[in-house]
Amino acid sequence: MDNIISGQAQKVEDVDGTRVQNEFSKFLKSFKGDKNELQYKTAMKELVQPEKNTIFVDMQHLYKFSNNLATTIELQYYRVYPFMCEALHLATLDGCDENERQQMFKKQLYVSLYNLDAKTKVRELSADKVGGLVRIAGQIVRTHPVHPELSRACFVCEDCGVSTRDVQQQFRYTQPTKCANPQCMNRTRFSLDVNSSTFVDFQKIRIQETQAELPRGSIPRTVDVIVRGEMVETVQPGDKCDIVGTLIVIPDIAQLSTPGLRAETSNQNRGRATDKSEGITGLKALGVRDLTYKMAFLACHIQQTESLVGGDASGAMEENDYLELWTKMSPEDRSVLKQMSDDKKIEKNIVDSLFPNIYGNHEVKLGVLLMLLGGVAKKSKDEGTSLRGDINVCLVGDPSTAKSQVLKAVEEFSPRAIYTSGKASSAAGLTAAVVKDEESFEFVIEAGALMLADNGVCCIDEFDKMDVKDQVAIHEAMEQQTISITKAGVKATLNARASILAAANPVGGRYDRSRPLKYNVQMSAPIMSRFDLFFVLVDECNEVTDYAIARRILDNHRSISEHTERNTVYKIDDIKKYIAFARCFKPKISDKAAEALVREYKKLRMSDSNNAATSSWRITVRQLESLVRLSEALARLHCGKEVLEQHVEKAAELLNKSIVRVEQPDIALDEDDFDNNIVIVEANKENQGGDDDMEHDGEKDETAKVDPAKLKISFKEYKQLSDVLVLHMRADEESQGEEEYDGVKQSALVEWYLTTIEGEMETEEDFNVQKTVCERVIHRLVHQDHILLEVEPGEDPTLCVHPNYVVSDE
């Protein structure tokens, strides 16, 4: 092997680098931690494993060992990093046997530094930071595939055959400047020996500065981050990360694109005679013209910032077992979580602590809390069918009802939440876009809002302002929780396991109570059915409520100006830990809970068929799945291993409030439809004699005396009256027996009702009003709602209750 010459032989020795190498080697071999044991001995032994190539070093340990060493590394990181890796390599070889030495000889090892005190904003990365150790934070917006990178190359001279080893590659294909053989004059003709060269994993990711660091009104800055070794594929788009590394300057690859030369390079040769042998030969010739450089960040350590209990990031929380997580917790965390789980008013206390600046709307806040907890995602073993566990919530309401405040509060609280506006977002911005990479010119997928919010919450404000084609784009993401893309030759199915919290304004700016929900919002039926909970927020004039809201707003202004914090039961960090721990539970549905689910679903279906005209939206099996998810979330809230009947009842109550709340238009009992029905009945009976006509005229005259304004009742009053009549008829049926029961005459039913409320009537006018209201409610129950059936039609029909009708519990 006489013709093999090391490329390192002609290098001038770096005295400072050698000193750092020796001191860092001593640090790895001798530093002892809190337990008076060698801190990094075990980690170095594990580097023998094929999949391990990185050792993680705490910067605080370096400062404790030697302040000069830590300061030198921090100020001249890029210069001394190869010496640190060499020190790690030699220290690892000292503890290996002969077989392990052969494996470790060609292995590239890395040092990952973390726990650096000072943090630099992405916007503050400038030329003076180049080469030093820097810590930055940002959100991942794009990840590239992992590629092999040529780290240390071995070149063979094509003239004399001498091999030059260990040629360091500086972010581009770098050949030796000349042949290592002193007698050979070759400077350009080299071939790469792939078998003798060292390749490492290489990945480029792009981060964007976080909203917390972004100055008001500024466009977010982005920076490309280069990761190697074990750091590749550790983060996904949407993760908020803490990155330690150094700022580097690299030539713009677009200027160095190969193969071939750019057309503009020939401009420098115009107007002067050139020899055929001349031309652009690479970097040297490229330096003749303007060479643009760009900055990138070479990372040695990257981790998700939102680490909660047990040291795990929130994205992996749901995969953990709660017992395993419990063992990783500190005693302080355990006592706090135990205290919270034993709290009987945990729902109210967490809700009040999460939304201290928003008054009232307890059901809305509870629904958002259950959305943060989520249900249990399931997948069948045979067919592979997936059932989503995430809960989607939509807030519909008048302006100034704190819809956007709820969204903003969730965005600030949730470790992985994306806030976007429906009007300003396109379909590609919500799902994913296919863009061309500036360097490789390959098409790569850039994550949209739903992908960035994977395993989190996507808050979409002004949902009703979205174009129809953009709403269609999220159909698949809301139910199947995937995004399918077929663009520019890229075919992929991406995960979008996010809960959607949407806020929408009603048509015309004000919610019309006389119309059901589906006519108040500009949403298609498929989109509406994909929401588990709808909450309608109506701005009503109420002296007590208005006073309380005004007090809360003024308190907020005073607390902000005086820099005082509102007293809450729980701290935000404690709630984050509790939710992360509760999401590890996967409660099973008990037999009683299953029966309760079926019973509540049947009630929803019956109420939908009974009030088809005024139903807020169609009740389908998706609402049954919503009940299951809400029940599981309630079980998780109490850290339960099983879904109980009380959880189902609470979930049904919440779902009913989100549905019934919008089914409250006022009932006008003097409508033209009612009068038309009376006219039709009278026209059919004109040939039955004048006495009947006289009777009808008398009834009409009596009805005419009633003020039409008093014939308009609220939906709540209509519901109460109909329930009273139905329950009375059911009681009669039970007392007489089903076989002997023939029904109740309408006149007898009206007379019974008037007798019941006799104490509330003072004048004859009150009597006429109540009688007319009762008669017209009965008429509506028969002809429109079909709750009552006419057993014997006629002027005074015999009535009975529809056998399938179920009286609601409200």
From Swiss-Prot:
The keyword DNA-binding is assigned to this record: yes
Annotated region described as Disordered, given as residue ranges: 685-705
GO biological process: DNA replication; DNA replication initiation; double-strand break repair via break-induced replication; mitotic DNA replication
Keywords noted in UniProt: ATP-binding, Cell cycle, DNA replication, DNA-binding, Helicase, Hydrolase, Nucleotide-binding, Nucleus
UniProt short sequence motif Arginine finger, positions renumbered to this chain: 529-532
Gene3D superfamilies: 1.20.58.870, 2.20.28.10, mini-chromosome maintenance (MCM) complex, chain A, domain 1, Nucleic acid-binding proteins, P-loop containing nucleotide triphosphate hydrolases
Binding, ATP: S400, T401, A402, K403, S404, N505
Residues at which ADP binds: R622, E625
Taxonomy, superkingdom: Eukaryota
Pfam family, one: MCM_OB
EC number annotated for this UniProt entry: 3.6.4.12
Its job: Acts as a component of the MCM2-7 complex (MCM complex) which is the replicative helicase essential for 'once per cell cycle' DNA replication initiation and elongation in eukaryotic cells. Core component of CDC45-MCM-GINS (CMG) helicase, the molecular machine that unwinds template DNA during replication, and around which the replisome is built.
Family affiliation: Belongs to the MCM family.
Protein name listed in UniProt: DNA replication licensing factor mcm-6
Species lineage: Eukaryota, Metazoa, Ecdysozoa, Nematoda, Chromadorea
